[in-house]
């Protein structure tokens, strides 16, 4: 569609308005607008449109249209079209917005008007040919705005030019960032060709100048990107030193004047700039810079002011503490006298200020938010060990004075408001002690430091004991809802975890001085008694914090790590506490089994208990341990009607049973332990599970728990399912699994499920079904051919219903969920490698669906998925190739029906492989080379047709070059699939790829 008249324009304007004002027609209008945008003439028409109107709806759609049009027809643009911007302020602003949005479109894959491969290559084209010019335009616009800074009209140019500069500097230059990645790139890989522009225009100075004048956050973000530029961008050491000196000079000026820090965002971004400076440059480089002394002094003042002022973001504190930690940890690498770093002078002051700030801030209720954000808070603490241990004795004195005073007041306080303050203060001190303990290494440790650790640790252990005694005496459970109290408990867990890691078990650092000091202060103590006290504390939490999910989860994590450690497990295996748990593990012992709302915690608990059970010392307790589960299964089987079975009480019991059993079987990692569990459950295995499915198939909470349990049950972890040659156990396991799978699939296929509930009620179940079926296929404990031999439909029924499940949702829906798509491709690979003939002989609907799925995954950004697809397709075609040579092969009819009657399948596969080889970088070249040769030898005519397509699709100037590249591709290759032939072809593919890339770049072909 095109705009040729005034009437056409009014029609276009009306569409732009309706796009925003009539949401019910948005999709229909969007399709119409796309017909305008994807017409190359739109690159000329947009000027006429903008001359007619300044309507914001039209301007927004014009910008959107230019993005689509330019990204689709970039190679057709003339230089004038690429650089055209009106000299008026309004059109200047529109031009800057267009350029910024074009960069975003090139940098981020959004929409479907280009494939991933096309988008990637056109993005590289922009980077190599025009991005530097756009960056120069942004710098010119900034200078233009600064020259007219007194005129308010130029403010918008300045802001838009800063946005454009940031878009240029934050471009994914090496195209390695995942589409879904949220991780920040710490090093900016600006091309070397930009060096002259940096030398001539000095953008660093420009952005600092703008910040000083306008206090612009965006200018600081641009500075952050420049500070992050790779060091190799500067060709000589003198240039690097000069650049570093400039940063130190400019940042020192801002540190002295505190320019713009009344704006929190400025303070945060500036903190990131300072931290990134140390990330990219060594302390050795910093200390040699003129002005370092002034810089480190002002940085210390800035950090202390930040710690004292609660208005600043915790993220600012995190970046500053990280910076100081990096500086301190680098002292050992400094050449010459380390005192020239001044870190021993300033670091203790920073540490003292941090501790005092947390104590002072605890008077505010807002501190609960920081303490309850466990992950962020622990992240902030990561830098504390370096700061605290540089002058450990001074740090210890400060902590002990505060701890003794506050803990004494806390234990005697009755006023609820004041009690909350003391709880927050104690929590922070315990967290700080915990992170200081964790910071002990073989490098920074000494006997004196170990004694200090003992001084600090004994106070925490005593506080834990007094606190638990106080809590158990409370008549009500309101403490479970007090955030300050929860924070204190989480700090205890954090401390105990760190103490266990450093001073107990195989990863601990040997030291007798800490236990000697603890014994002096609190009575005889060693690592075993401390471990038991930790386990007792875990048990206390299970009882008194049953309703708090976070405390229970972290207590379970600590329990698991204690049981799973080689040395700590030996201490725990053969003792009275363990024996009591194995004999009695009901909700009376672990109240959270009934009271906690998170059923995952049940699995974690029984995984840990199972680890204790399945040892030589404790396996004799199995019958006594498993008896409660046996009673539950018998109770479920004895319920006679579906109505009686379908109650909330039974539902909770079923979910609990399945999650508990999954935890137990997860820890049965030996043949002996697995066989013990199998012999107990297999008699009632399929009967009880099928009964559960029949009644609760519409409840994803039940079916997910059931399918995940089976998935773990059939998982041949550590070869635990390899039975004796005389045993039929492997066949029994798969036969029962097939029954359950077929029952689930047949019922869920009949269910009417809405689009919004599709993942929860169906796709998640399909995903787990595929996972458990894959584990059966690759387990190696069952010969599936036996089923067909004896007329048992277990295997064929499982395959049939698995593909019915896959076909019951669209491929787009299945592939839109990463876990489901990965499970699907993994299952297809297992089937194609182990049961190729079964795949080839499937009905046409299933076979085409499989091939389309594998074709789609060939260009997946996940190399594992693309490689699996390659392997699967190659195996199918290889088997077909060899069977075609056998005139009496039974599967000839299936090959002709599935392959040759659908010739476009092979055509599309070869086409995509060639395209990936030419244009893509993120792929396994050896896998794709093998697959391409297999396809070519299997069907030469299809390859010949595609070769002609590629020859004609390039410019008329170079068809002979393309043809020559294809001739070289097949040079010295033979008509066979032997390894030697594949290796030769792989070498040819490397040459072919190189030649085709050169041809592509010379002709400007990126699509």
UniProtKB/Swiss-Prot annotation:
One of its GO terms (cellular component) is nucleus. The keyword Protein transport applies. The lineage of its organism: Eukaryota, Amoebozoa, Evosea, Eumycetozoa, Dictyostelia. It is found in: Nucleus; Cytoplasm; Nucleus, Nuclear pore complex. GO terms for molecular function: nuclear export signal receptor activity. It comes from the Eukaryota. One of its GO terms (biological process) is mRNA transport. It comes from Dictyostelium discoideum. Belongs to the exportin family. Keywords: Cytoplasm, mRNA transport, Nuclear pore complex, Nucleus, Protein transport, Translocation, Transport. Mediates the nuclear export of proteins (cargos) with broad substrate specificity. InterPro entries: ARM-type_fold (IPR016024), XPO4/7-like (IPR044189). The keyword Transport applies. Transmembrane segments: none annotated. Its main location: nucleus. This is Exportin-7.
């Amino acid at each position: 569609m095109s705009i040729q008249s005034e009437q056409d324009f009014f029609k276009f304007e009306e569409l732009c308005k309706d796009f925003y004002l009539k949401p019910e027609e948005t999709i229909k209008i969007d399709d119409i607008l796309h017909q305008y945008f994807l017409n190359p003439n739109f690159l000329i028409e947009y000027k006429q449109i903008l001359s007619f109107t300044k309507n914001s709806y039209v301007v927004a759609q014009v910008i959107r249209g230019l993005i689509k049009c330019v990204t689709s027809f970039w190679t057709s643009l003339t230089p004038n079209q690429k650089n055209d911007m009106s000299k008026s302020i309004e059109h200047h602003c529109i031009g800057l917005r267009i350029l910024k949005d074009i960069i975003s479109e090139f940098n981020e894959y959004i929409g479907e008007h280009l494939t991933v491969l096309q988008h990637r290559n056109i993005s590289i084209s922009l980077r190599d040919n025009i991005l530097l010019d756009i960056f120069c335009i942004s710098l010119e616009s900034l200078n233009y705005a600064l020259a007219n800074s007194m005129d308010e009209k130029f403010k918008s140019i300045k802001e838009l030019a800063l946005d454009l500069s940031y878009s240029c500097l934050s471009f994914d230059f090496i195209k390695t960032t995942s589409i879904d990645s949220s991780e920040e790139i710490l090093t900016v890989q600006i091309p070397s060709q930009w060096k002259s522009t940096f030398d001539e225009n000095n953008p660093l100075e420009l952005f600092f100048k703008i910040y000083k004048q306008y206090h612009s956050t965006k200018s600081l973000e641009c500075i952050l990107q420049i500070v992050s530029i790779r060091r190799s961008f500067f060709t000589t050491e003198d240039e690097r030193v000069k650049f570093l000196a400039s940063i130190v000079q400019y940042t020192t000026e801002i540190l002295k004047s505190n320019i713009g820090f009344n704006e929190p965002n400025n303070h945060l971004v500036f903190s990131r700039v300072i931290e990134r400076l140390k990330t990219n440059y060594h302390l050795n480089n910093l200390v040699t810079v003129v002005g370092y002394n002034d810089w480190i002094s002002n940085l210390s003042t800035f950090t202390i002011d930040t710690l004292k002022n609660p208005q600043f973001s915790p993220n600012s504190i995190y970046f500053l503490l990280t910076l100081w930690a990096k500086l301190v940890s680098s002292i050992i690498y400094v050449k010459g006298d380390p005192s020239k770093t001044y870190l021993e002078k300033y670091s203790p002051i920073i540490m003292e200020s941090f501790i005092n700030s947390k104590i002072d801030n605890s008077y505010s209720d807002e501190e609960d938010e920081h303490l309850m954000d466990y992950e962020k808070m622990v992240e902030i603490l990561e830098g504390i060990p370096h700061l605290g241990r540089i002058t450990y004795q001074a740090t210890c004195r400060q902590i002990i004075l505060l701890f003794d005073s506050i803990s004494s007041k806390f234990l005697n306080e009755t006023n609820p408001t004041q009690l909350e303050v003391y709880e927050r203060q104690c929590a922070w001190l315990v967290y700080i002690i915990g992170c200081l303990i964790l910071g002990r290494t073989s490098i920074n440790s000494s006997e004196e430091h170990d004694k200090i650790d003992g001084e600090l640790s004994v106070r925490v252990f005593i506080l834990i004991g007094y606190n638990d005694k106080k809590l158990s005496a409370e008549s009500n459970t309101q403490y479970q809802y007090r955030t300050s109290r929860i924070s204190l408990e989480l700090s205890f867990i954090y401390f105990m975890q760190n103490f266990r890691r450093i001073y107990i078990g195989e990863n601990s650092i040997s030291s007798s001085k800490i236990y000697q000091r603890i014994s002096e202060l609190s009575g005889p103590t060693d690592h075993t008694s401390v471990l038991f006290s930790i386990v007792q504390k875990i048990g206390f939490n299970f009882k008194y914090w049953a309703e708090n999910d976070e405390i229970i989860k972290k207590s379970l994590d600590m329990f698991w790590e204690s049981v799973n450690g080689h040395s700590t497990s030996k201490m725990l295996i053969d003792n009275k506490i363990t024996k009591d748990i194995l004999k009695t593990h009901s909700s009376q012992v672990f109240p959270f089994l009934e009271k906690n709302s998170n059923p995952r915690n049940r699995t974690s608990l029984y995984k840990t208990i199972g680890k204790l059970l399945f040892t030589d010392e404790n396996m004799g307790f199995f019958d006594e341990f498993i008896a409660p589960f046996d009673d539950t299964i018998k109770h479920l089987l004895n319920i006679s009607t579906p109505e009686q079975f379908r109650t909330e009480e039974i539902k909770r019991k079923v979910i609990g049973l399945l999650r508990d059993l999954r935890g137990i079987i997860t820890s049965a990692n030996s043949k002996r332990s697995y066989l013990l569990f199998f012999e107990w459950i297999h008699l009632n295995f399929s009967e009880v599970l099928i009964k559960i499915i029949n009644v609760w198939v519409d409840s994803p909470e039940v079916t997910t728990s059931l399918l995940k349990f089976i998935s773990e049950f059939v998982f041949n972890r550590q070869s635990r399912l390899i039975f004796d040659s005389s045993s039929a156990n492997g066949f029994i396991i798969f036969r029962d699994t097939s029954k359950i799978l077929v029952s689930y699939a047949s019922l869920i296929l009949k269910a009417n499920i809405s689009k919004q509930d599709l993942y929860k009620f169906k796709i998640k179940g399909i995903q787990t079904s595929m996972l458990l079926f894959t584990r059966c296929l690759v387990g190696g404990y069952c010969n599936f051919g036996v089923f067909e031999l004896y007329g048992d439909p277990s295997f064929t029924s499982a395959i049939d219903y698995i593909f019915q499940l896959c076909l019951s949702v669209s491929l787009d829906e299945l592939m839109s969920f990463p876990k489901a798509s990965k499970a699907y491709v993994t299952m297809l690979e297992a089937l194609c490698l182990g049961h190729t003939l079964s795949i080839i002989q499937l009905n046409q609907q299933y076979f085409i669906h499989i091939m389309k799925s594998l074709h789609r995954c060939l260009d997946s950004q996940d190399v594992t998925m693309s490689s699996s697809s390659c392997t699967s397709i190659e195996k199918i075609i290889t088997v077909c190739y060899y069977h075609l040579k056998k005139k009496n092969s039974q599967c000839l009819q299936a090959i002709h029906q599935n392959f040759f009657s659908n010739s476009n399948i092979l055509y599309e596969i070869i086409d995509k492989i060639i395209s990936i080889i030419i244009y893509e970088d993120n792929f396994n070249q050896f896998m794709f080379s093998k697959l391409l040769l297999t396809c070519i030898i299997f069907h030469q005519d299809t390859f010949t047709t595609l070769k002609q397509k590629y020859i004609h699709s390039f410019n008329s100037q170079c068809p002979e070059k393309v043809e020559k590249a294809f001739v070289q591709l097949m040079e010295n290759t033979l008509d066979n699939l032997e390894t030697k032939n594949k290796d030769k072809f792989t070498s040819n593919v490397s040459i072919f790829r190189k030649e085709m890339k050169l041809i592509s770049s010379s002709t400007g072909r990126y699509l």
